[in-house]
Amino acid sequence: MALLVGGTLNPTTHLSLRSRAGRNSENVWLRSAASSQTSKGRFCNLTVRAGTPSKPSEPIGPVFTKLKPWQIPKRDWFSKDFLFGASTSAYQIEGAWNEDGKGPSTWDHFCHTYPERISDGTNGDVAANSYHMYEEDVKALKDMGMKVYRFSISWSRILPNGTGKPNQKGIDYYNNLINSLIRHGIVPYVTIWHWDTPQALEDKYGGFLDKQIVNDYKYFAELCFQSFGDRVKNWFTFNEPHTYCCFSYGEGIHAPGRCSPGLDCAVPEGDSLREPYTAGHHILLAHAEAVELFKAHYNKHGDSKIGMAFDVMGYEPYQDSFLDDQARERSIDYNMGWFLEPVVRGDYPFSMRSLIGDRLPMFTKEEQEKLGSLCDIMGLNYYTSRFSKHVDISSDYTPTLNTDDAYASSETTGSDGNEIGPITGTYWIYMYPKGLTDLLLIMKEKYGNPPIFITENGIADVEGDPEMPDPLDDWKRLDYLQRHISAVKDAIDQGADVRGHFTWGLIDNFEWGSGYSSRFGLVYIDKEDGNKRKLKKSAKWFAKFNSVPKTLLKTTNNNATVTASVSV
């Protein structure tokens, strides 16, 4: 779910936000008065090395350079069980915002109430019109030879009031989509929640700021399991909670748009130092309740999997020094560990506890036991990397999410003056495939090598790029994806248990704060021609890539198999 922000970010807010306010807000805390651009990320004070960085691959250079033919990845590099697919989210593609009984979501409310917060003043009312054109999306997947499709369920489409009586027409839409995917041999992977909370719950008690959301989310998740679980065997409870909490409650540039008084956001009535942690805590509790319910009642045959999709960023030390090595560890831990550590070990990273203090809620012993080791699969959404640089801050410094993020800055340029990689059409994404390899090896070495899917990975086309004047000739995206698919193979060769790669995204869509000005799709949406789907160069490459007969592929990947079939 890529994103970009509209509006001007306050350079004095110092919020450690991930560079994706549509993926458009580099770590907002690093925006200086000169509007320097940096990145997302969170940091922790671990003294243990968070994985050994992989050996540097061939330098990319300061600009995009196309791969040589022998460097381009081949399908037979991977086992036949390895899954290639694409991802989307409900609000970004569906449209039909008030049709067939759907209730308003927080994003409907945000875009309608604060249109100035979207860079082009648009909204998701129509989006890519996938509510009416989902068969075209399925056809595009089929044409590309994709075996899996990850999409999300709109909570307010199937539960207009967030709770209570379900909306059967909304359920019918997802049943029709799922059945169409299966008819075409494509396996559905479902994200239960991708940022679009029912506005009714926001109005009733403040959404994820109130613990009531835990039971209401559990009710929503159970409705999904009941309605779709006979065919959907792979679930993600939440998508990118880290980004959501920072941008929605810290910086206020995403729905519901809350921040502290005095900051520039839609609703300056919040507490940017506490609310992100409160919302995140309730997300984790809701995840635990839903997963426990799923395992107790909706996976009787043991053929289904459930997990969470985390937004992650790679980091390298700013220079070869102990302090910057430690800064790198803190960066990785705050960026990835905030939500990953609780679902693996039952609590937040030690560094977060020590730095944030009483602003970070506590788990009860029962909650810790329920949280830890619940995930069957992990999703990693990776786009880019940064350099981590140690920052000295006096002990009496006023707390901010930046200083929590732990005495480290996130830089696009290293101590030698070189950028971490070539910048893409989207200013916050610098291409650095090695960062993905390193993170996968961290998952292997530090977190027990769980089954991992790359649930998002891609770049955007932007209007006015002189190197890509034709929106269908997206050679930069193709080069980016080829290099990152190769990076996944590097990690697999070193023992990481990676099961699949989902490109973000399937189609051009509403990119949050950037509206429609940033296009992440493999498939072009022609707004001037009734949202007609047109395959880009990258999509046509996938069609060729995926055409290798299965008989020529290896049987397993790292001796690990994955359930890739469903019963109708």
Curated annotation (Swiss-Prot):
Residues 1-50 form a transit peptide. GO terms for biological process: carbohydrate metabolic process. Keywords: Chloroplast, Disulfide bond, Glycosidase, Hydrolase, Plastid, Transit peptide. Its main location: plastid. Optimum temperature is 25-30 degrees Celsius. Pfam families: Glyco_hydro_1. A beta-D-glucoside binds at residues 92, 194, 239-240, 383, 456, 504, 511-512, 520. Inhibited by castanospermine, Ag(+) and Cu(2+). 34% inhibition by Zn(2+) and not affected by EDTA. Its EC number is 3.2.1.182, 3.2.1.21. One of its GO terms (cellular component) is chloroplast. Optimum pH is 5.5. Gene3D superfamilies: Glycosidases (3.20.20.80). Disulfide bonds join 259-265. The active site is at residues 240, 456. Transmembrane segments: none annotated. Changing residue 456 to A: Total loss of activity. One of its GO terms (molecular function) is DIMBOA glucoside beta-D-glucosidase activity. PROSITE patterns: GLYCOSYL_HYDROL_F1_1, GLYCOSYL_HYDROL_F1_2. It is found in: Plastid, Chloroplast. Changing residue 520 to Y: 19% loss of activity with DIBOA-Glc and 2.5 fold increased activity with DIMBOA-Glc. It is an enzyme of class 3 (hydrolase). The keyword Plastid applies. Involved in defense of young plant parts against pests via the production of benzoxazolinones (hydroxamic acids) from hydroxamic acid glucosides. The preferred substrate is DIBOA-beta-D-glucoside. Can also use esculin and genistein glucoside as substrates, but no activity with salicin, p-nitrophenyl-alpha-glucoside or substrates related to cell wall components. Belongs to the glycosyl hydrolase 1 family. Homohexamer. This is 4-hydroxy-7-methoxy-3-oxo-3,4-dihydro-2H-1,4-benzoxazin-2-yl glucoside beta-D-glucosidase, chloroplastic. It comes from Secale cereale.
